[in-house]
A protein has these predicted regions:
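Positively charged, low-complexity intrinsically disordered regions
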Residues: 15-19, 239, 420
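Detector for long, low-complexity, acidic/polar
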Residues: 42-46
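Soluble acyl-CoA-dependent acyltransferase catalytic core bearing the H(X)4D motif
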Residues: 13, 23, 34-38, 52-89, ...
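Short, surface-exposed beta-strand/loop micro-motifs that present aromatic residues
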Residues: 49, 161-167, 427-435
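Low-complexity, glycine/alanine/valine/leucine- and proline-rich hydrophobic stretches
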Residues: 390-470
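Cytosolic, low-complexity regulatory segments enriched in Ser/Pro/Gly with interspersed Lys/Arg
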Residues: 1-40, 75
């Protein structure tokens, strides 16, 4: 199907890709159940609370492949279909059921209707246009489909829960993936990406038809619920639309800041040295980097000393809650919040600011998380971007430097860069990735109001820790 041109990006084709085959039996590791009716996956509180935010949109910039056009697209669609064989719920559709008692439930139907695969071209865009500046060009947002779509929209409009757009550039290719956040979190997102790239990389060598031989762990598709949790969860709303809040999208710009492994070690050592002699837990590398950002952003926003500010950070539940297996595909994350005034953050230093973030994460032990899940069933609350990004005083960080981004070699070279799409972009959104040199390096994709972002780039203390683009 022919598409149109959008910001120099022209859609060439758009189709649904279904899982390669239907495996014969269920084993909890990605095979279809041997029955004719449509399998239904009920969503957990961790899934449902994210129903009113945008899809996850992240992608990788790859070198120019040895083939192009239809040959490239057909090969990628073939490996994509094989990856969907393991992650077959990603080819399904979200649905909701409004009940006569004033409640609604949401679930994932494993219908095999397919995931969207878009082929696009942007011959006027070069790799250097994306990576040679601190500022991210706006064209990057055009490298994704299903832009600015909320999770609930997939149920009300029967949209795919997963989409991929392959955009051929002048001297490279960008693979942008979009996943409904109620279907999976960042761990699940990169698990699928890693699986797909590994399947494609050898051209099938060493991987059998049933996909044995993969080094990437097999996905575990069965959802995890508390023993006391009702399934399905009936939320006290007459319609799914009553849960949804669409946030006002203000004008923002993005910069991509990379911190070398040496710079990260220096920030971590400084933060821990400043807190030496106090009864505090060791501050992590990520907490030190985020504290460095928080302090600089308060300066860039020109916040008065008495102004309250907060930082919301994603806290992973895998490894914190017993019973969640390795390879779990679903959401297993919550938001922790650190709060202080701008004056405190400036005066008390990097170590104290990092300690606030450390305490926000440490407050989520297993007992706390279980209590939160039990309470959610009785009193559901939802994540809204308008709450996470508050009037130019807040920051929110998602993703993780532990995600394997630069291991996604599709067979013609490792990624040159990683960039995300328009999803959930608001003033104060900072997305963290592993750095391109790996080995402890990190990158922050920071989205802010243009004037404040310009002041951040001009902040000498902040930029001294940043590696400038070549």
């Amino acid at each position: 199907m022919e598409g149109g041109t959008d910001g120099g990006v022209q859609v060439v084709s758009r189709r649904m890709v279904r899982p390669f085959t239907s495996p014969p039996m269920a084993n909890g590791n990605g095979c279809h159940p041997a029955k004719e009716e449509v399998e239904v996956i009920h969503l957990t509180p961790w899934d449902l609370r994210l129903i009113s935010i945008d899809y996850i949109q992240k992608g990788i910039l790859l070198p120019k492949p040895p083939v192009s056009g239809v040959s490239l697209v057909k090969a990628l669609q073939s490996s994509f279909a094989r990856a969907l064989r393991l992650f077959y719920p990603f080819a399904g559709r979200l649905a909701s059921e409004e009940r006569g008692d004033g409640t609604v439930s949401v679930f994932l139907r494993c219908t095999d209707e397919g995931a969207e695969f878009v082929h696009a071209v942007a011959p006027g865009v070069a790799v250097a246009d994306i990576v040679s500046s601190l500022y991210t060009p706006s064209v990057v947002w055009k490298f994704y489909s299903l832009a600015l779509v909320l999770g609930a929209d997939a149920a009300t409009e029967s949209l795919p829960v997963l989409a991929v757009q392959v955009t051929e550039l002048a001297d490279g290719v960008f693979v942008g993936m979009t996943l409904n956040h109620s279907v999976g979190d960042g761990t699940a997102f990169w698990h699928f990406f890693n699986t797909w790239s590994e399947i494609h990389r050898p051209g099938g060598v060493g991987i059998t038809d049933d996909l044995r031989g993969l080094s990437t762990p097999l996905p575990v598709l069965q959802r995890w619920f508390l023993e006391t949790c009702p399934v399905p969860i009936l939320m006290p709303f007459r319609k799914l639309e009553h849960i949804v809040r669409r946030f006002e999208r203000t004008t923002v710009q993005e910069c991509f800041f990379t911190f070398s492994a040496a710079s990260v070690r220096k920030l971590k050592a400084r933060a821990n040295d400043e807190m030496a002699g106090t009864a505090t837990a060791a501050i992590s590398s990520l907490q030190a980097v985020l504290a460095h950002l928080w302090r600089a952003v308060c300066r860039a926003r020109c916040l008065p000393p008495e102004q309250g500010t907060f930082y919301s950070v994603v806290v992973g539940c895998r490894g914190r809650v017993n019973g969640i297996p390795p390879g779990y595909v679903g959401n297993a994350m919550v938001f922790g919040k650190a709060e202080a005034t701008a004056g405190e953050i400036e005066e008390k230093g990097l170590g104290w600011t990092a300690w606030l973030l450390n305490r926000a994460v440490a407050s989520f032990d297993e007992a706390t998380m279980r209590q939160s899940l039990e309470r959610w069933v009785r009193e559901p609350d939802f994540t809204y971007m308008s709450n996470l990004s508050s009037a130019g005083t807040a920051l929110v960080t998602g993703s993780s430097p532990r995600f394997d981004v630069f291991g996604n070699d599709f067979g013609w070279g490792k990624p040159v860069a990683v960039r995300s799409g328009a999803g959930n972009k608001a003033d104060g959104k900072a997305t963290v990735f592993e750095g391109p040199e790996r080995g402890g390096s990190m990158s922050l994709e920071v989205c802010m109001a243009p004037d404040a972002l310009a002041r951040l780039v001009a902040d000498e203390e902040f930029m001294n820790a940043v590696s400038l683009p070549a």
